């Protein structure tokens, strides 16, 4: 059966139709139509009919363009969206498409409203692996897309509801998938113990792959462990969700830094996944930088040192340069290390700060002043 031009999304088959290059501007690059069926055989039959109809329209449109030197009107291929039809809002869920993992938001919120927290958690877990972690730290791309903002000041608290499901769920150990008794004989190496490698492990282990994780630090978690302060992400929450994957049968080699990929590829693995992230902070090379080396910390290195307890105190006066989420974590961490006078200095206007709105609010609630439109010129000490 030819399924080349069929794809399935959220239990509905769609048909994709190739568009001639000279018509793409008028018709769009991805021309497709929903077949509204869950059955593959039925989808194939409907596809044939849809393709024939689209072919005739494409030929007519090409003829129209040719006869009018490329300026002819092109017939609309897709029907105009009927937003008065309630079914439209069940098929096109803005927040769900805004989520990089396409988490079925309405489904798990409905479960929470019914008090079914475990079910809500598992719906999340299938999509995003770390509901308890994301419920505390996600950047929330879903919430600006929430339709509630069209009629109310604020969106539904989609992110925090993940945390609700995670905090009130029952023990889900027996609900998590298990590795099959027999593997398929394929060995996969995962370099880096952060969320990317852990997600790959979760998906591959249940398919019978033998996965081995290599991590330079003594624990898995990656930047979730080293760069998110514990007052935002409690260690027990992080450990619980990371352990769910480790306990699926993932082999681990901690304190194992891979320094030569060339040599590593000689190992007995069928495939290698590199999930090392990009843990490199930004320096500020202005006058006096070298002379002030002893008193300067790079943002993510500073947070990592705190996480591993290499730093347990700091001076009384702290200036944080930058207006992103890392800067907000650094200034709040400084207060907890004993600093008495903490300021944040940003180049941009306050309204253009890169940090998430709630991160800025949390810092300001702790009485940390943010000085906008200040450009550092020189380090004095």
Language-model features: where?
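Feature captures the FAD/FMN-dependent oxidoreductase FAD-binding
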Residues: 182, 187-191, 239-286, 378-381
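Short arginine-rich
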Residues: 49-62, 130-135
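Extended interfacial segments that mediate partner engagement and assembly in macromolecular machines
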Residues: 168-209, 224
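Rossmann-like dinucleotide/flavin-binding elements
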Residues: 189-214, 253-262, 280-283, 301-357
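Rossmann-like dinucleotide-binding cores of NAD(P)H-dependent redox enzymes
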Residues: 210-213, 217-248, 252-253, 304-306, ...
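Ferredoxin-type iron-sulfur electron-transfer modules and their immediate structural context
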Residues: 74-187, 235, 265, 274-293, ...
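Redox-cofactor binding/interface segments in oxidoreductases and associated redox assembly factors
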Residues: 272-275, 298, 320
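Short, Arg/Lys-rich segments that mark the N-terminal edge of DNA/RNA- and chromatin-recognition modules
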Residues: 1-37, 62-74
């Amino acid at each position: 059966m030819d399924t080349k031009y069929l794809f399935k999304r959220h239990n509905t088959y769609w048909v994709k139709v190739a568009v001639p290059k000279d018509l793409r501007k008028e018709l769009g690059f991805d021309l497709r139509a929903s077949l509204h069926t869950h059955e593959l055989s039925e989808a194939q039959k409907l596809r044939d009919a849809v393709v024939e109809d689209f072919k005739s329209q494409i030929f007519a449109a090409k003829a129209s363009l040719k006869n009018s030197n490329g300026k002819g009107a092109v017939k609309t291929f897709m029907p105009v969206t009927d937003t008065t039809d309630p079914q439209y809002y069940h098929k096109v869920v803005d927040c769900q498409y805004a989520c990089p993992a396409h988490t079925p938001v309405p489904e798990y919120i409905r479960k929470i409203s019914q008090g079914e927290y475990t079910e809500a958690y598992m719906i999340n877990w299938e999509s995003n692996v770390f509901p308890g972690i994301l419920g505390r730290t996600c950047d929330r791309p879903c919430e600006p897309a929430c339709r509630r903002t069209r009629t109310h000041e604020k969106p539904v608290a989609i992110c925090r509801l993940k945390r609700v499901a995670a905090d009130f769920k029952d023990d889900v150990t027996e609900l998590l998938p298990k590795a099959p008794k027999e593997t398929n004989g394929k060995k996969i190496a995962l370099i880096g113990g952060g969320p990317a490698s852990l997600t790959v492990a979760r998906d591959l282990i249940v398919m019978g792959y033998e996965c081995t994780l290599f991590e330079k630090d003594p624990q898995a978690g990656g930047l979730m462990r080293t760069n998110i302060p514990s007052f935002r992400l409690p260690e027990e929450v992080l450990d619980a969700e990371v352990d769910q994957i480790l306990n699926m049968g993932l082999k681990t080699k901690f304190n194992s830094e891979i320094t030569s990929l060339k040599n590593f590829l000689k190992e007995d693995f069928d495939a290698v996944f590199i999930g090392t992230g990009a843990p490199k902070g930004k320096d500020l090379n202005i006058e006096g930088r070298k002379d002030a080396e002893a008193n300067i910390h790079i943002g993510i290195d500073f947070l990592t040192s705190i996480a591993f307890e290499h730093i347990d105190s700091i001076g009384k006066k702290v200036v944080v340069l930058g207006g992103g989420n890392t800067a907000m974590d650094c200034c709040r961490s400084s207060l907890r290390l004993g600093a008495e006078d903490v300021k944040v200095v940003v180049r941009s206007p306050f309204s253009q700060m890169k940090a998430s709105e709630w991160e800025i609010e949390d810092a300001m609630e702790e009485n940390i002043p943010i000085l906008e439109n200040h450009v550092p010129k020189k380090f004095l000490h």
